[in-house]
Regions:
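Bacterial Sec-dependent N-terminal signal peptides
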Residues: 1-34
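Carbohydrate-active catalytic/glycan-binding domains of CAZyme proteins
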Residues: 26-320
Length: 320
């Protein structure tokens, strides 16, 4: 059974999405969630100081990649921290790095493990800043974890905000907790390309054994590139892949963050995507295909490469 099917079932019904290493000097206590009287006011100021990182639990989790690996569920997430202060972190000896790592045995109580990387990989920084006027490459976003044989592959992206100047890289380890070794670049884009190299999601086709990486956000739509299973890198160096999904007007009709999973009972691949502006009508939609690389169609059989809207809508602001 696919790793995600323990978490996600009946994919056209209401869906629950649970969605060198740089470790903390000692293990953190397991976080126990507490209810808030008003979730809109829940800003977790009580544990927002940099020295409180062992108490973060699920606080400061953005764009998580979660998978059952051995006895634990492991979760990796974007470098976005409420009240982040790297100067304060250095002064107080906080080992602040990049890509937060957590683990849990029940998906409720989470232990903060630390950060995967001590620094943003230099190759990614050079690519982004040299193509964005010295801007960008300040955080690592949207990591994705997947096992292969006796290794664990951690995909990640570095970008310049609001531009197509981006880089998706790969690190490997023999443990889901690291340490991580940089393996290289999968795809990189700039203002001259149609697509944007962020938000990777990787899957192996159950029938062909081929590996595919879906990626992209905003500009130009979502794309899919074939990977070499043995290396985890692009099968053909420099290949940016083929178009999978798009919308008509990216200034108002946003499309981002593909997530591809396989449903073994239905023998189909489901592509979850985020639609519309983050701060207003943000929502999640899903399409499906008989092949991991597509083509994908919506509930009504309409191709998601079409520029009109696709359905169904699974989640929306304050709705499920």
């Amino acid at each position: 059974m696919n790793e995600y099917t323990d978490i996600m079932k009946n994919l056209f019904l209401p869906v629950l999405l649970v969605a060198g290493s740089f470790f903390v000097s000692c293990t953190s206590s397991v976080f126990t969630p507490t209810p808030s009287a008003n979730s809109w006011d829940d800003n977790y100021l009580s544990v927002a100081k940099m020295e409180d990182y062992r108490q973060w639990g699920t606080y400061n989790v953005h764009d998580p990649s979660c998978r059952k690996l051995g006895d634990y569920y492991y979760m990796y997430s974007t470098d976005a921290i409420f009240g982040e202060n790297r100067k304060e972190a250095r002064e107080k000896g906080v080992p602040l790095g990049f890509i937060q790592m957590r683990r849990s045995k029940d998906l409720v109580h989470w232990e903060f493990l630390g950060w995967a990387f001590p620094e943003i990989p230099e190759e990614a920084v050079q690519w982004v800043q040299s193509h964005a006027g010295g801007q960008g490459a300040t955080i690592i976003m949207a990591p994705y974890i997947i096992p292969y044989k006796d290794k664990y592959r951690l995909y990640y992206c570095v970008s310049a905000f609001g531009r197509k100047t981006s880089y998706i890289g790969l690190a490997e380890s023999t443990s889901p907790e690291g340490p991580w070794t940089q393996k290289g670049c999968i795809v990189k884009t700039d203002d001259s390309t149609a697509m944007n190299a962020i938000d990777p999601s990787v899957i192996a086709d159950e029938n062909t054994g081929k590996w595919w990486m879906h990626y992209g956000s905003f500009f130009g739509g979502l794309y899919c590139v074939e990977l070499n299973p043995e290396t985890g890198l692009a099968l053909n160096e420099g290949d940016l892949g083929h178009l999978v999904a798009r919308r008509a007007n990216y200034r108002k009709d946003n499309l981002e963050a593909p997530e591809i999973i396989y449903h073994p009972e239905l023998k189909q691949y489901y592509l979850f995507t985020s639609y519309d502006p983050l701060m207003t009508t943000y929502n999640v939609r899903v399409s499906r295909s008989d092949a991991a690389e597509g083509p994908f169609t919506d509930y009504f059989g309409k191709a998601v490469k079409d520029t009109t809207n696709n359905f169904p809508i699974l989640t929306a602001p304050s709705s499920f």
